[in-house]
From Swiss-Prot:
<keyword id="KW-0206">Cytoskeleton</keyword>
<feature type="binding site">
    <location>
        <position position="139"/>
    </location>
    <ligand>
        <name>GTP</name>
    </ligand>
</feature>
<feature type="binding site">
    <location>
        <position position="227"/>
    </location>
    <ligand>
        <name>GTP</name>
    </ligand>
</feature>
<comment type="subunit">
    <text>Dimer of alpha and beta chains. A typical microtubule is a hollow water-filled tube with an outer diameter of 25 nm and an inner diameter of 15 nM. Alpha-beta heterodimers associate head-to-tail to form protofilaments running lengthwise along the microtubule wall with the beta-tubulin subunit facing the microtubule plus end conferring a structural polarity. Microtubules usually have 13 protofilaments but different protofilament numbers can be found in some organisms and specialized cells.</text>
</comment>
<dbReference type="InterPro" id="IPR037103">
    <property type="entry name" value="Tubulin/FtsZ-like_C"/>
</dbReference>
<keyword id="KW-0479">Metal-binding</keyword>
<dbReference type="GO" id="GO:0005737">
    <property type="term" value="C:cytoplasm"/>
</dbReference>
<dbReference type="GO" id="GO:0046872">
    <property type="term" value="F:metal ion binding"/>
</dbReference>
<feature type="binding site">
    <location>
        <position position="143"/>
    </location>
    <ligand>
        <name>GTP</name>
    </ligand>
</feature>
<dbReference type="InterPro" id="IPR023123">
    <property type="entry name" value="Tubulin_C"/>
</dbReference>
<dbReference type="InterPro" id="IPR018316">
    <property type="entry name" value="Tubulin/FtsZ_2-layer-sand-dom"/>
</dbReference>
<feature type="binding site">
    <location>
        <position position="70"/>
    </location>
    <ligand>
        <name>GTP</name>
    </ligand>
</feature>
<keyword id="KW-0460">Magnesium</keyword>
<keyword id="KW-0378">Hydrolase</keyword>
<protein>
    <recommendedName>
        <fullName>Tubulin alpha-1A chain</fullName>
        <ecNumber>3.6.5.-</ecNumber>
    </recommendedName>
</protein>
<keyword id="KW-0342">GTP-binding</keyword>
<feature type="binding site">
    <location>
        <position position="70"/>
    </location>
    <ligand>
        <name>Mg(2+)</name>
    </ligand>
</feature>
């Protein structure tokens, strides 16, 4: 088996985790306490043992780890409807939180907890026959997500160097912010994890708020609405690991097809169709329509305009009632559209995946039940605008050295700030260079 261990760090990581495992149990016909129902699609297909391990009593337990430096969020899981799904030992909480401070999560408070966490990771790994890799869910802006998330990735890199490490990161939104020091935490965590993470799927809250408001007509989206939408994306990405399909995509294949250079590993996620229950009956939702709507900025999980950039690689993951003939026709149609530009050194650029299991529907959720859906993961140079926005906010704060004393007081050196900022400047430059046409790049090289 090719197992995957999911690690959910901090409030954002844990709450996205709740939405994901809720959806996985529905997809595989598991009850909230981890037992297979009689009409479950997974009765004859053991593919989902990549994400669940079976106990001797026939119960299925998620291969997951919940970690937070303060107890409140995980206590909700311990007392919630899925409390008997998770193994109690895979929920680790500290006594005091990281207070939105990267340095607390990474150095002071994080140091006390990291060995406990790595011990639990080792137990989960020992329980696997052929571990494929790790999924780490965290936010960039919080203290635990940024600091402790980075620390865990560093340790995973040391202990399990050859295994894939994929991140699912909540990126700071352009105008919404959950804390003043978000830019600091985000720049520091990106700098630390850049060399340790193989592929990082980003979502930002503002983009998802807008999707909930525009496509799903939710006047005031709450975190549950956002997380359930993110869970659909995660589920689409992992579906081919959990179900059989006519064109399966492996964890390593994501990297091979989406990451042209090690540092440029931040694909954009887009989901289609995102339709509310009252609109669903009026839409045909053909493969071509779905594919086309994935290239619309309105369906994207990060605020940036792909029309301003060029695509380097693109993975189209279909689920449900889809045949290869339709997907090939849809891709051929996309290639004729002039608005979608690929870099000239990567002419083909499309990777397809098809999973036969239709998308699941959360009872009482916002999304309508559909026969087919798709998720597009695209590595585009447009995402560099998100980095430059973040860097600008960092510069405004750092020019006055505002709030820096909180970080230095937790044992960080001020030099780390400038080092991290330089690394991100280099990342912006990397994106600029890969987006250049080969001819322009040669001219520029000649000038040096």
């Amino acid at each position: 088996m090719r197992e995957v261990v999911s690690i959910h760090v901090g409030q954002a990581g844990v709450q996205i985790g709740n939405a994901c495992w809720e959806l996985y149990t529905i997809e595989h016909g598991l009850s909230p306490d981890g037992r297979l129902s009689d009409d479950s699609p997974s009765k004859h297909d053991d593919g989902f043992s990549t994400f669940f391990s079976e106990t001797s009593s026939g119960k299925y337990v998620p291969r997951s780890l919940y970690v937070d430096l303060e107890p409140n969020v995980i206590d909700e899981v311990r007392n919630g409807p899925y409390r008997s799904l998770f193994h109690p030992e895979t929920m680790i909480t500290g006594k005091e939180d990281a207070a939105s401070n990267y340095a607390r999560g990474h150095y002071t408070i994080g140091k006390e907890q990291i060995d406990v966490v790595m011990d639990k990771v080792r137990r989960l790994v020992d329980n696997c026959n052929g571990l494929q890799g790790f999924f780490v869910f965290h936010s960039f802006g919080g203290g635990t997500g940024s600091g402790f998330g980075a620390l865990i990735l560093e340790r995973l890199s040391t202990d399990y160097g050859k295994k894939s490490k994929l991140e699912f990161s909540v990126y700071p939104a352009p105008t919404l912010a959950s804390s003043v020091v978000e830019p600091y935490n985000s720049v520091l965590t990106t700098h630390t994890t850049l060399e340790h993470s193989d592929c990082s799927f980003m979502v930002d809250n503002e983009a998802i708020y807008d999707i909930c408001k525009k496509n799903l007509n939710i006047a005031q989206p709450g975190l549950t609405n956002l997380n359930r939408l993110i869970a659909q994306v995660v589920s689409s990405i992992t579906a081919s690991l959990r179900f059989d399909g006519s064109l399966n995509v492996d964890l390593n294949e994501f990297q091979t097809n989406l990451v042209p250079f090690p540092r440029i590993h931040f694909p954009l996620a887009t989901l289609a169709p995102i339709v509310s229950v009252d609109k669903a009956g009026h839409e045909s939702n053909s493969v071509a329509e779905m594919t086309y709507s994935c290239f619309e900025p309105g369906n994207q999980m990060v605020k940036c305009d792909p029309r301003d950039g060029k695509y380097m690689a693109c993975a189209l993951l279909y689920r449900g009632d889809v045949v290869p003939k339709d997907t090939n026709a849809a891709v051929a149609l996309i290639k004729t559209k002039r608005t979608i530009q690929f870099v000239d050194w990567c002419p083909t650029g499309f990777k397809l995946g098809i999973c036969n299991e239709p998308p699941a529907h959360v009872p009482g959720g916002d999304l309508a039940k559909v026969k087919r859906s798709m998720c597009m993961l695209s590595n585009t140079t447009a995402i560099s605008s998100a980095w430059s926005r973040l860097d600008h906010k960092f510069d405004l704060l750092y020019s006055k050295r505002a709030f820096v004393h909180w970080y230095v007081g937790e044992g960080m050196e001020e030099g780390e700030f400038s080092e991290a900022r330089q690394d991100l400047a280099a990342l912006e430059k990397d994106y600029e260079e890969v987006g250049m046409d080969s001819a322009d790049a040669e001219e520029e090289a000649a000038e040096y």
